[in-house]
Amino acid sequence: MNATSTPSLPYDANRLRELAHLLIGTIGEFAQAGWTPATSSNFSHRLDEHHVAITVSGRDKRCLTEEDIMAVDLEGNAVGHPHTPSAETLLHTQLYRRFPEIGCVLHTHSLTQTVASRVYAGAGHISLKDYELLKAFEGHSTHETTLDVPVFCNTQNMNILAAQVDTLLDKQRMWGYLINGHGMYTWGNTLADARRHLEALEFLLHCELNLLKLRGYL
């Protein structure tokens, strides 16, 4: 990644470098929390109207460098970078295409998220109700509400999964979803918003799993 903008690039390389540092710091904290095991997980930030900064595939999230953050267009194609973006890039870019206000998408694989995805796969969703922390989600101003978190079937065909996500987005507002046996996607208008949604869902999923244990269901 060059220190100055290259005229041949269709995006601002300085901006990409800034976002790389912003993402690397946050991703490192997620890695320390154990949410990105074995090079899993991928993270992105809107670069401009037509491009996204996203993690390169297969990199250890504990020790990322600028070269581990690349640019893709809104179709998920690499732009100005020799490396390959995450196989799940389409799940990021579909959100940026659909919602111009979205600025950041986070995909993690914590133990809590993965176990919850298995437990609730049959139901197809998890209903989070009457938690004070529901106020952490954009558009929620009271605990007296219910947030449905979808659980999608895992597939290696990202086009199929993206279509399923789009279909549900036509029906309901959501700030995250689980993939069975996989992990969780969260997003927001800013990195801070996306992180708040991620941390809130992580905590609430942990609450739900602990309630199931206390009631003898797990």
UniProtKB/Swiss-Prot annotation:
Disulphides: none
Annotated positions binding Zn(2+): 107, 109
Highest rank taxon of the organism: Bacteria
Entry EC number(s): 4.2.1.109
Needed co-factor(s): Zn(2+)
UniProt-recorded Gene Ontology molecular function terms: methylthioribulose 1-phosphate dehydratase activity; zinc ion binding
Pfam families to which the protein is assigned, alphabetical: Aldolase_II (PF00596)
Keyword RNA-binding listed: no
Keywords recorded for this protein, A-Z: Amino-acid biosynthesis, Lyase, Metal-binding, Methionine biosynthesis, Zinc
Gene Ontology biological process: L-methionine salvage from methylthioadenosine; monosaccharide metabolic process
Recorded GO CC terms: cytoplasm
Record has Metal-binding as a keyword: yes
InterPro entries registered for this protein in UniProt: Aldolase_II/adducin_N, Aldolase_II/adducin_N_sf, MethylthioRu-1-P_deHdtase_MtnB
Pathway(s) it belongs to: Amino-acid biosynthesis; L-methionine biosynthesis via salvage pathway; L-methionine from S-methyl-5-thio-alpha-D-ribose 1-phosphate: step 2/6
Catalytic activity: 5-(methylsulfanyl)-D-ribulose 1-phosphate = 5-methylsulfanyl-2,3-dioxopentyl phosphate + H2O
Enzyme class at the top of the EC tree: lyase
Cofactor note: Binds 1 zinc ion per subunit.
Protein family membership: Belongs to the aldolase class II family. MtnB subfamily.
Function: Catalyzes the dehydration of methylthioribulose-1-phosphate (MTRu-1-P) into 2,3-diketo-5-methylthiopentyl-1-phosphate (DK-MTP-1-P).
Protein known as: Methylthioribulose-1-phosphate dehydratase
